[in-house]
């Protein structure tokens, strides 16, 4: 089933704009749904890299969005894939 990593492009500082990445790998077949959430609500505009595959023919993709970290907001990445019975959510 997909491996999910959620991390920032730059060291996070509250109040300083950053990029939040959701890297999803080790999945097959290639169809996958990736959502990024702020306080449990879907972030409407996220960027997606092209789907790529590894030497073992598993797929990987990177979703990312601009965001500004704060103490009060929580961010997560939710992935839906045929290999899992229900969506998997990983918090940042």
From Swiss-Prot:
Cystine residue pairs: 22-77
Positions the record marks as coiled coil are none
Q: Which Pfam families match?
A: C1-set
Q: Which CDD domains match?
A: IgC1_beta2m (cd05770)
Which terms under GO biological process does the entry name? antigen processing and presentation of peptide antigen via MHC class I; immune response
Q: Which InterPro entries match?
A: B2Microglobulin, Ig-like_dom, Ig-like_dom_sf, Ig-like_fold, Ig/MHC_CS, Ig_C1-set, MHC/Immunoglobulin
Q: Which domain of life is it from?
A: Eukaryota
The Gene Ontology CC terms held by the record are: extracellular region; MHC class I protein complex
User: What PANTHER family does the entry give?
Assistant: BETA-2-MICROGLOBULIN, MHC CLASS II-RELATED
Record's subunit section = Heterodimer of an alpha chain and a beta chain. Beta-2-microglobulin is the beta-chain of major histocompatibility complex class I molecules.
UniProt similarity note? Belongs to the beta-2-microglobulin family.
What role does it play? Component of the class I major histocompatibility complex (MHC). Involved in the presentation of peptide antigens to the immune system.
In Swiss-Prot or TrEMBL terms, this protein is called: Beta-2-microglobulin
Organism for this UniProt entry: Mus caroli (Ryukyu mouse)
